[in-house]
Amino acid sequence: MSFSSDVRNELARIIPEKECCRKAELAALLAISGDLVVGEDGRRILKVQADNAATARKIITLLKENYQIPSTFKALEQKRFKRKRIYEVNVLLDGEDEALNKELEEILLLREKETTPVLNRSLLGRTCCKRAYLRGIFLSRGSINRPEGEYHLELVLNDSRMALAVQKMLDKFALEPGLVERKNYLVVYLKESEKIVDFLRVVEASRALLNFENVRIIKSVRNNVNRQVNCETANLSKTIDASLRQIELIKRLLEEQGLEILPGNLRDLAEMRMSYTDASLKELGDLLDPPLSKSGVAYRMRKLEESVKEILQED
């Protein structure tokens, strides 16, 4: 099962306690995934599709808790896409209860001859309702990469008004989403791991958030270890190259002039380098008498190399 499916299954099981939040989330689910059709008897039916059974069951639950509206539920085979099955909830909008019909129309802002519901912004006055609405948006049109891979979360919308509204709403939570057009859709997306974590916190996907954070921490530690190893490897390579260069110079001096030509402090360092070819500068400094700091050894080693080069050039 994908990480997106895990998140959706978790969100599908969250039923808001407040009626205002239930209405906001239901309105998002109906507005994003719903299409209006006219039945044979002339009455309007709202067909809402979901890509998993848990989301479909949530739509039915919210309809029942808010409006006591009966709805039908069925599974459909969808062969054109990778997922083999989708779920459809059918809601009769022109029932016998006129007051209920009117309330549904107001929530969805249904207009004559329109086939797509539009969200009523008056439902989003409170922060808790915005959270519920974004939860409904993700359930309908959201996806998120596994935290082990590249960080990416997106909400795919087919209505420009809805996309801009979602982008502004995410901005209210300081998530700073991007917006890009992809074929016939508008995609609101997040690519920073911190922003994705914040989004999961906003929609109250606590279990997914914990899993995401655990993987993110492990990745961060692993990356830090890799950087440290690479840095140490590079430093070791530099140390080996410098040691080989120094030993080669000292060998040439031994063959052509001898070490006695060097000043005492440089001669001691040259002899120490030849005796301990694998030692680092710090280790050489500890072996000298009196001991010398790493920076002191580095300075003296540069003087040694310069002196040897001058002597060999004069010869």
Curated annotation (Swiss-Prot):
Keywords: Cell cycle, Cell division, DNA-binding. GO terms for molecular function: DNA binding. One of its GO terms (biological process) is cell division. It comes from the Bacteria. Pfam families: HTH_WhiA, LAGLIDADG_WhiA, WhiA_N. Residues 280-313 bind DNA. PANTHER family: CELL DIVISION PROTEIN WHIA-RELATED (PTHR37307:SF1). Belongs to the WhiA family. Involved in cell division and chromosome segregation. This is Probable cell division protein WhiA.
